[in-house]
UniProtKB/Swiss-Prot annotation:
RCK C-terminal domain segment(s): 139-222
GO BP terms, alphabetized: potassium ion transport
GO MF annotation, one: monoatomic cation transmembrane transporter activity
Organism of provenance: Bacillus subtilis (strain 168)
Family: Belongs to the KtrA potassium transport family.
Main location group: membrane
Residues that, per the record, bind NAD(+): 16, 36-38, 56-57, 78-80, 103-105, 109, 125
Subunit structure comment from the entry: Homodimer, tetramer (dimer of homodimer) and octamer (tetramer of homodimer). Part of the KtrAB complex formed by an octameric catalytic ring of KtrA and a membrane associated dimer of KtrB forming a potassium channel.
Name of the protein: Ktr system potassium uptake protein A
Function: Catalytic subunit of the KtrAB potassium uptake transporter. The 2 major potassium transporter complexes KtrAB and KtrCD confer resistance to both suddenly imposed and prolonged osmotic stress.
Keyword Cell inner membrane: no
CC annotations in GO: plasma membrane
Domain RCK N-terminal as annotated: residue spans: 6-122
Length: 222
């Protein structure tokens, strides 16, 4: 099983949310550029980033000097300053950054970010609340991502019932209309697993599908 290849991320805004993203991406072995206007915050996260830089992300020249165009993903995690967050996002769009993820402060901020073309808008408290509730209600659910009101991606813990079965044995797509995107086994990740790949108890299955179909697979297939 092959590992996920390393990517390049820039995290702008090193508050509690941005700092935690920076730490986790760095822990996973990705290249991370950590950016904040506050020197104290930059120093605090310098050991959790490939590069940590003091910069004003609302200034285009400063973004360019960071080599921001070299990054596939930029996460705008600026705190309560909605104006700075919005302007930074707008500049990143103008610089053709392919994937811009932005933390929204409220509903109105969300609507503005939609208008200017943010690729993914994050509400940390709301998103985390959904994940925690899902985990509390089902012990087999390790993680949960809403794609829409109807579809989601879920990480499920393989039960003893699935041990030693292959993907083709489960036939999840035909029986339940779901797709197994990946299998995690002892830190290794197999993306787009082959029909003959074997599942072991305690493996993590990353499954995408309609929420009702995923729940049906949990209830009947696991």
């Amino acid at each position: 099983m092959g590992r996920i290849k390393n990517k390049q991320f820039a995290v702008i805004g090193l508050g509690r949310f941005g700092g935690s993203i920076c730490k986790e991406l760095h822990r996973m072995g990705h290249e991370v550029l950590a950016v904040d206007i506050n020197e104290e915050k930059v120093n605090a996260y310098a050991s959790y980033a490939t590069h940590a830089v003091i910069a004003n992300a609302t200034e285009e020249n400063e973004l360019l000097s960071l080599g921001i165009r070299n990054f596939e993903y930029v996460i705008v995690a600026i705190g309560a300053n909605i104006q700075a967050s919005t302007l930074t996002t707008l500049l990143l769009k103008e610089l053709d950054i392919p994937n811009i993820w932005v933390k929204a402060q409220n509903y109105y901020h969300h609507k503005v970010l939609e208008k200017i073309g943010a690729d993914r808008i994050i509400h940390p408290e709301k998103d985390m609340g959904v994940k925690i509730a899902q985990s509390l209600s089902d012990e087999n659910v390790l993680n949960y991502i809403d794609l829409s009101d109807e579809y989601s991606i879920v990480e499920l813990l393989a039960t003893r019932k699935l041990d030693s079965k292959s993907i083709i044995d489960l036939n999840v797509r035909a029986k339940y209309g779901c797709t197994i995107l990946a299998i995690k086994h002892h830190g290794d990740i197999c993306l787009s697993p082959a029909p003959e790949d074997i599942i072991r108890e305690q493996d993590c299955l990353v499954i995408m599908g309609h929420k009702k179909d995923i729940k049906r697979f949990e209830n009947e297939g696991m």
